[in-house]
Design a protein with these regions (language model features):
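Domain-level detector of nuclease and nuclease-like folds
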Residues: 1-152
Length: 152
């Protein structure tokens, strides 16, 4: 089991203090080594590429926990069953979003295998990622999982 970073240290290269703070326990979750060094690392690299291309992204990352997830340290630390990443490109027109859910284990294959709608992440987490968007815009953006809009 690795300490999987929610905000990767590689995204904080502007400042040594920021890099150091990325190792705080508030920024890590128990993540299987196969995920942390495999599919999740590939997704983090892709997000960095998209950020360079689109100038700015909003990125939300977190665990998806549910009853029955395994635990560590005598039940004090839950091992999430999955992780999500919700990404918005707010500075491009039309605005676009994409979400990913990766099970906490080996995740092979391409990004499209794990792409999902923001609505699905909201359903699993109980969170509302873009509450200030007008309802029609929120519904349009959150209901689809169009990875093609990000790769072209």
């Amino acid at each position: 089991m690795d300490r999987g970073h929610l905000v990767p240290a590689a995204d904080l290269k502007w400042n040594a203090t920021a890099i150091g703070q990325s190792f705080y326990l508030t920024n890590v979750c128990p993540m299987h080594k196969a995920l942390n060094e495999g599919g999740w690392a590939k997704l983090e690299e892709k997000v960095r590429e998209w950020t360079a291309r689109d100038s700015a992204l909003l990125v939300f990352t977190g665990p998806i926990v549910s009853e029955g997830d395994s635990t560590l340290t005598g039940g004090r630390v839950t091992v999430p069953g999955a992780f999500y990443k919700v990404i918005m490109a707010p500075c491009v027109r039309p605005m676009r979003v994409i979400a990913f859910i990766y099970p906490n284990g080996y995740c092979g294959g391409s990004l499209d295998r794990y792409a999902t709608s923001v609505d699905e992440v909201e359903r699993l987490t109980g969170l509302d990622f873009f509450p200030t968007l007008p309802d029609a815009e929120q519904q349009r953006l959150e209901r689809t999982a169009n990875l093609d809009a990000w790769t072209n």
